[in-house]
Each structure stands twice: as C-alpha cells, then as structure tokens.
Amino acid sequence: MPSSDHWLQLQRNVRFGETDAAGVVHFYQLFRWCHEAWEESLARYGIAAAAIFPGCRDICQVPTVALPVVHCEADFQRPVHGGDDLRILLEPQRLNPGCFEVKYRFQLEDMDVARGLIRHLAIESESRRRCALPEPIDLWLEASTVGRLEPI
C-alpha cells in the first residue's frame, strides 16, 4: 500500500479559465476540485475508475453500487487566484456502513484558503436502495485512518 501522503495530499494549479472577471476562483469550481481530488486519490491508492464510476471506457461490468453525493459544503477563507499552486488535503471518514464523507482543505503556502466537504451514500444501482459501501471504498477508508486517531 502506498504512503497515505501520496494519495491523501494532492497538488493543483489554478487555471485562468477557473476564475471569474475579478481574477478569483468562482465558487462552483471548489466542488469540481473536491470531486477530482477524490477521483485522483482513489486512482493513486490503486482503485480503477471503472470499479466505482459507471460509464468508463472499456468497462467490463457496470458497478452494482452507486455513490451519489447527498450533501456538500464549501467555504472560502481567502481569495484563490489563477496561477496559485494549491495543496489539497483529503480527510475521508466513514459515517456508517453505507455512508462516508471526505473533508478537503485547500492550502496556499501552508495557509488554508478554502474547505470543502462531500458526503456520499451507497445505493444499489438497480433498486436505488441503501446498501453497504463497495469493498474498494471500504479499504480506501480504512487505509486513510492508519496512523490517525478516530473519535470514539
């Protein structure tokens, strides 16, 4: 298993096209960045996109469990500008056997500039009924807690 530093701490350079007329990041970009960071974290951990996300090219089998977003939050502490090199810290947490969330901290030179949170619920793809998280996500969540104290 790779070091969690490799898959829970990511980098992102803010592109000009992600900013508004004032040169600062438009609010909705943060949610896109959060989801992209989650996808990259899964890939770096060793989970193929096709194992989690339907519609992937060359997919052999459609995932039987979907992970829709059921809640999201975003807070900007400081303006984020085009050209900023951000560090993204992910903190996944299992909430129950069928639900988890990921907290995201966006830092510029060790200063928090934004935070995000996305919560996912596991549902059976066909019936849309709640179910347990798929095994790859369970393993990713478990590995993310190694060396970190969990609340009782």
Curated annotation (Swiss-Prot):
Reaction catalysed by this enzyme: 1,4-dihydroxy-2-naphthoyl-CoA + H2O = 1,4-dihydroxy-2-naphthoate + CoA + H(+)
Keywords for the protein's UniProt record, in alphabetical order: Hydrolase
Pathway: Cofactor biosynthesis; phylloquinone biosynthesis; Quinol/quinone metabolism; 1,4-dihydroxy-2-naphthoate biosynthesis; 1,4-dihydroxy-2-naphthoate from chorismate: step 7/7
Top-level taxon of the source organism: Bacteria
One of the GO BP terms on file: phylloquinone biosynthetic process
Catalytic residues (UniProt): 20
EC numbers for this chain: 3.1.2.28
Root EC class: hydrolase
Gene3D superfamilies referenced in this protein's UniProt entry, alphabetically: Hotdog Thioesterase
GO molecular function terms listed in the Swiss-Prot or TrEMBL record: 1,4-dihydroxy-2-naphthoyl-CoA thioesterase activity
Alphabetical list of InterPro entries matching this protein: DHNA_CoA_hydrolase, HotDog_dom_sf
Keyword Chloroplast: no
CDD domains attached to this UniProt entry: 4HBT
Disulfide bond entries: none
Its biological purpose: Catalyzes the hydrolysis of 1,4-dihydroxy-2-naphthoyl-CoA (DHNA-CoA) to 1,4-dihydroxy-2-naphthoate (DHNA), a reaction involved in phylloquinone (vitamin K1) biosynthesis.
Family recorded in the similarity comment: Belongs to the 4-hydroxybenzoyl-CoA thioesterase family. DHNA-CoA hydrolase subfamily.
Name by which UniProt lists this protein: 1,4-dihydroxy-2-naphthoyl-CoA hydrolase
